[in-house]
């Protein structure tokens, strides 16, 4: 009986110490059509999650659960014509709205990766707002 009580106590501590980290992204765009493509990257610039979600009322909400605590980055674009890619002009400049976490912009290319990093920790949901331009 004492072994069973110890086991139950151990399991209880496991649930208390386990963290279910949640990040919710509110993505705002200029138009009410197409889909938002979003990539979540870890601090090593490796893709850990991806999502494609329809835009409704010029907004898309994406929620990732069961993340590990740490630093992450997001890049997103609004595929307005539903062709599955970010359209660019002949010079490689995007013709569709795009954005990064922390709403940073780069000069003549994407921003420095370090500037897009944000922290996920604790027992509460982290909410990130990204404006696509």
Predicted segments with their positions:
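Exposed aromatic-hydrophobic patches
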Residues: 60-66
């Amino acid at each position: 009986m004492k072994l069973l009580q110890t086991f139950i106590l151990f399991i209880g501590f496991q649930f208390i110490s386990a963290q279910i980290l949640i990040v919710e992204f509110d993505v705002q765009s200029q138009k009410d059509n197409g889909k938002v493509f979003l990539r979540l990257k870890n601090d090593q610039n490796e893709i850990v999650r991806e999502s494609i979600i329809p835009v409704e009322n010029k907004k898309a909400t994406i929620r990732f659960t069961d993340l590990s605590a740490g630093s992450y980055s997001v890049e997103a674009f609004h595929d307005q014509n539903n062709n599955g890619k970010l359209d660019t002009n002949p010079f490689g400049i995007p013709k569709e709205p795009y954005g990064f976490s922390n709403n940073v912009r780069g000069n003549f290319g994407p921003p420095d990766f370090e500037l897009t990093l944000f922290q996920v920790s604790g027992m509460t949901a982290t909410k990130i707002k990204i404006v696509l331009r």
